[in-house]
Each structure stands twice: as C-alpha cells, then as structure tokens.
Amino acid sequence: MGWWSLGSSGSKADPEKSKANDSKSSNRRQQEEGEQSFIPPPLTSRTSSSSSSKSTTDWNSSLNAFDWSQFKQPRNLIPTALLTGGILFVVYVQRRYLRRFPEATDISSSYFRSRSLLGRVTSVGDGDNFRIFHTPGGRLVGWGWLPWMKVPTARKELKDKTVHIRLAGVDAPELAHFGRPAQPYAYEAHMWLTSYLMNRRVRAYVHRPDQYKRVIATVYVRRWLDFPPLRRRDVSYEMLRRGLATVYEAKSGVEFGGTENERKYREAEMLAKNRRQGLWKDFGKRGGVNFESPREYKTRMQSLDMSAESSSSSSSSSNTEKNPGLVGSLLRKVWPFGSKKDGT
C-alpha cells in the first residue's frame, strides 16, 4: 500500500522535494551574506573628497566641543567665584588705600577734602611747612618693620619721594632766606616744630594744592609723652596756643579746613595774645617794639624788593646813557651834530 495513506497526519511531501527546498534556502542565505559583506568601490573622486572633508569636520567639531555644564556644578562654581572676588578685592584695596604718592603733585584730586595721608616726617623747612614720606597703611601693611618697606633716611634716597605739606590756617615767622633777614621768633618756631614732628608719624587731611607745589593740610600727631598718652594733637592749634604762629590772613587763598577749625584757631590766637606768649610777648606794650605779623613782614619785604628792582633798573638805564658802548661811540663819530642834551 505504500508509506503514505489517507489516515496519516502531516502533508503530502516528497523527500526529494524537501531537499530541494533546503538547498534553495541555503543558497539564499549565502547570497544575502555576500551582499552585506560587499563594499562598493568609490564612484568618483568628488565623492571621496566630500566624505573625507565631512569626516575631518566631524573630528574637529568633536575636539572643540566643550562641556560648560561642569562649571555650573557647586564644587567648581564656588571656588572660582571666591578666587575672582578675592583678586578684585585686593586690587580695590591697593588702589584706594595702599597707593603711595611720591610728591604733592602726584596726589589724586579725589583725596582733597575727603581723604588723608599717613606718613613719616623727614625734614622741617620752616615754621609752618615740612615734608613727609607717604606710608599708606602704616605698620599694618609692614611700613617700618618689613625689610623691603623701610622709610629712607639718606637725602639722595628721599629726593623726589616726599610730599611737601603747608600747615593749614597758620602763618609762622619767616626764617632768613633769599637775602632777607629773619623775623623775630622765627628760629624758635622752627626749632619747636622740628622737635615736635621730626621722624614721627603724622596724619595729614589734605585740602588743596598751592602755587608752590605743596599741599595745604590739617596735620595731627600722636605722642607717647602726652596726657593722656597718644592723644591726637592738631599741630596748627598747638603752634597758635604757644604763640609761635598767627592765624593766616590774606585777601584770597586762605584755607582752614572748615569753619570749626577757623573758630578754634582764632580762639587759640586770642588766648596766646592775652597771655603774651611767644611772639605776642611785647604786643600792646607802651614803648615796646612795634609788632609785625608774618603777613605784614612778607608785604614789607615784597615792597622793598620792588623798590630795589626799580632803583636798579633806573641806575642801569642812566649808566647806559653815560656809557653808550662801542656802537654808540661809533655813531657819535659818524654823526657829529651831538644830541639834544648837548644844546644843539
């Protein structure tokens, strides 16, 4: 009857036919694998160049890519902000509080009537002016005790490095200079100011510059041998109280540093007058010498200088007329008619 019958389950299939189907499926799989492994050659040079440039661009873009999100993390953001803020704060403090001015002409205009200078007195030129070496920050930043922040003492080292200060509100007797004689009590005022300020640290509240490349300032000093110790003293007030200076009087350019200082200075001058201290010793006495203030002394010296200049110019012109010189003598020989003074 054969191996296949109607009652048997399955499909009617021939063994040879199934083998053929298996061979076809294997051939199909091999063909698909061959297509996948096959890489077609480049079509043109243009296509290859475009693909290479594209790959180069992708490589550069991947190298230049930067991830900014890492800076937004607190572990990176907080130290960066603190470091930047610290640098800006140090620069601000240095420019505003630790900037050193070599001379009075270098002082910034923002300092006048609002800021002060801390420095050490290096020389006293007269009874009302002296020079300081500006030391911004003082001992707190190392001036005087750090090796590289010493105040110079030699005259050559101090050249063009000191601020010339004129005391505000006072006028001291003039020392002898420019051929002029010294005024009474000029030496005493100069010696007192030298002993009071020399080599000491002072604080000068600057008001404005003057025509002599100085800066007018109200100056304060602290001394250990004071009562109470280290009490802040106004140098101008102390000079007026001791009768070593007068209140500055002029038609213009008077600087007191405020109305309160002017009132205080005039009261100190009046007190010295009443006590007849210093240069007020013979003031108002009958038969005593006539009192001459520093302002009156300067005015008298200026008038004497002007009269001396006028007399010297007139004498030089008369000498020129009497002695005409080589050119004049030659002209007289050429022109024999003389002059009007000869009566012709």
Swiss-Prot record:
Pfam family, one: SNase
Stretches with biased composition (Low complexity): 44-55
InterPro entries xrefs: SNase_OB-fold_sf, Staphylococal_nuclease_OB-fold
Localization annotation: Mitochondrion; Membrane
Active site: R166, E174, R214
Polar residues composition bias: residue spans: 1-11, 300-309
Protein name per Swiss-Prot or TrEMBL: Probable endonuclease lcl3
Species whose genome carries this gene: Talaromyces marneffei (strain ATCC 18224 / CBS 334.59 / QM 7333)
